[in-house]
Amino acid sequence: MKRRSPLSPLWLGAFGLLALNLNPVAQAADDIDPRLRTIGPSLMRDAPDAIPARPPSGQATSNGDRLGLAEAVLTAAQWHPSIAEAVGNLYKQGEGINVARAGYYPQISGGLRTGYDTGYGGDRNSQALNLSLKQMLYDFGKVDNAVSAAQAAATRAQANILLVVDDLARDTAYAWIETRRYEQLMAIARDQIRGVGDIAGMARQRSDMGASTRSDVVQAESRVEGARATLEEYQSQYERWRSTLAELLGRVAPPALAEETPPELNQACKRSSGSSDRLPAVLMALALRAQSQAELAQAKAEAYPTLSLQPQVNHYLDNDYNRDNRSLDRTQAGIYLNVEVPIYQGGAISARSRAAGHALSAADSAEDAARLQARRGLAEAMAQTSGLSRRLTSLEARQASIQEARQLYGRQYLDLGTRPLLDLLNAEQEIYQSRFELAGTRSDLLRLDVDCLYNSGALRTAFGLEGRNLQGVEIEP
């Protein structure tokens, strides 16, 4: 009778116990860390004092059915697929952390081995079931650095969500401001048609009475047609921006817009003092640097040995497995201490080290570029705001003198007959041109306020997005 090894039941029991104990581990990492769903600059690095978030109750609400700027931004952020895409990428990177952490746990594998072997006094074919466990004991930081790199990649994905939110908020604000701009310009253009039409009516009346020439009527009617063409141009731009806003809001058509100046902007360029440390692009560069540093350390650790413990069990399926050695047991168990050292990998380890070093340099440059772009954008917006503010003051002061000249020309044309119709038409057109410029300048200032908030990292605060859940993630200061 064949002698049975007393170690076989022992090892089988040990493997059974390990399988039972490790079963929760196999199922524990089936989701990302819940903390990854809370995103904010202050959570990603040692940030300066965060700008206080607007309370949810402070969110601008619609005036009746009218849509405010902050409400439009929030509506877009709650549904837009670009944010959903960024959140999905975060979940992917979160699972990457679980993959990296799996290196800390035992790796159990099993399978069927078949082949040709020699020894035991002869050569033979053999088939065997194999069950093995491998537990890393020490690897000079390979797994630690892999986890650090995965965590940095997740942080970068978080910063990307903030960047997508900021870009979407800026685009929605632009569309809201432009739609409102052309609403106002269309209203002024309609007033212009009525004003020039009244002058054309007077010119026709005077022509019928013989008090003026037919050329006055032709000139006046030409100005009326020009005013109508202006209205059609503004109508075309209005439809364009209204369609853009509707797409950002996920609607067929947006509701009417609030008429009040958005309090969320509050002359942001005149008080902008944000820190570039809150900018998503800077946070992404910092996360890329941390990831590159971890990958560089991991690549260097690859050149060092890995110490692991490896128990395994083989169960032969051949009927003549012990043909050449009758003392050979069908089930064999062993435990081994492995020291694995890479000898030659075709230069892969060196290449990975160089690649990580280049990525580290690129991350430093990306941070510098992000800060430079933000400073430049902020400086340009503030400089333009200063110039447009002075122009706005001049336009407002000019309105009174233009109105006075229009009234004077009207009396001289109608009562005294000393002023030609062309002067009256020019004065009328100058009034409305000034109103067009006033409305356009005010809208330009609103756009520049959005730029200042964007380039100072304060856009989410201004629109009340902080402290809110957007498509599964919590936005924090």
Which role fits each region the language model picked out?
Residues 2-3, 35-38, 159, 164-278, ...:
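Periplasmic alpha-helical coiled-coil/stalk elements that build and connect Gram-negative outer-membrane
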Residues 2-4, 27-46, 61, 428, ...:
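Acidic, low-complexity, intrinsically disordered peripheral segments
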Residues 12-21:
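Bacterial N-terminal signal peptides
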Residues 47-75:
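Regulatory alphaC helix of protein kinase catalytic domains
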Residues 84, 107-124, 137-163, 283, ...:
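Small/polar (Gly/Ser/Thr/Ala-rich) solvent-exposed segments
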Residues 85-100, 164, 168-188, 193, ...:
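Amphipathic alpha-helical coiled-coil segments
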Residues 131-133, 337:
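Membrane-embedded beta-strands of outer-membrane beta-barrel proteins
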